[in-house]
Amino acid sequence: MTLTHDPKEPTPDSEEYKLFEPPSNKTLGGKNFDELENWDDDSKFYKDMVEYHDKIIGRIIAKLEDLNLREDTLIIYAGDNGTTRGIVSMMGDKEVIGGKGLTSDTGTHVPLICNWPGTIPESTIKDDLIDASDFLPTMTEAAKISLDQEYIVDGKSFFPQITGQDGNSRDWIYFYFDPNSPRVLRPVVEFVRDKEWKLYSDDKLSLIHI
C-alpha cells in the first residue's frame, strides 16, 4: 500500500528530504488522538507524494515482469476516500476538489483501475456501481476459488465486467459513514444510491439527483 496522505511530507526524491524533520515524528509515543495527529504539513509536497506513489507502482510492475509473473497477476488500484480537502487536482481540463470526510462524490467516488495483460481488454471503461464489499468475490472469482456457502458475502463480483462479459452489476449501493472522531463532531450519515439518485436517511429524507 502507498498513500498520498496527511501529513504531506517530502519523499526520498524531494530536494528537502535530507533536511526535513517529518511532522509525523512529532506523533511518536502519542497516547491520545490529539497527540497522534499533532502535525503541521505542507501541501506543496502533495505533488511529490503523487509522483513517488507512481514510482513505487512502477517498481512493483517491473518486478512482476522480471519474475515473468505479469500475465499471471491481477493488479487492482483503488482509492479509499476522496483527497484531503484543500487539495485541487486536475483530470484533463476538469478540476477535482478534495472531499475526504464528505459523503458527496468528492469524498466517496474514487479511482478504480484493474489491469491484467491478456485477461482484461485494454481501454476497457465501465461505469458500474462498485463498493468495497465487491473486492472479495471479485478476487476469488479471478483466482477460480469458490467461497464456502457458510460465508455470507454482501459483495458482487465485477470480474465478468472487466473481462468483457455482461456480469451481474449492482443496481444500488448502501453507504454508512461514522466520523468517530473527537475532532469531527458530525452525526452518522447513511444513504443509498444508484447511478442517478441518492437518498439520505436524515430527518428530511433528502433525495438528490446526481
Label for each model-derived stretch:
Residues M1-L136, T140-V153, V189, W197-D202:
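Active-site-proximal cap/lid insertion segments
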Residues I208-I210:
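Conserved small/polar residues in nucleotide/adenosyl-binding loops
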Residues I162, P179-S181:
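Segments of small-molecule ligand-sensing domains
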Residues L185-P187, D194:
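Short beta-strand-initiation
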Residues D166-S169:
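Basic phosphate/pyrophosphate-binding loop/patch that engages nucleotide-derived ligands
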Residues F158:
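Charged (Asp/Glu and Lys/Arg) segments that form or flank catalytic channels of large polymer-
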Residues A143, I162-T163:
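A broad structural signal for alpha-helix termini and local helix breaks/kinks
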Residues D171-F175:
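WW-domain-binding short linear motifs
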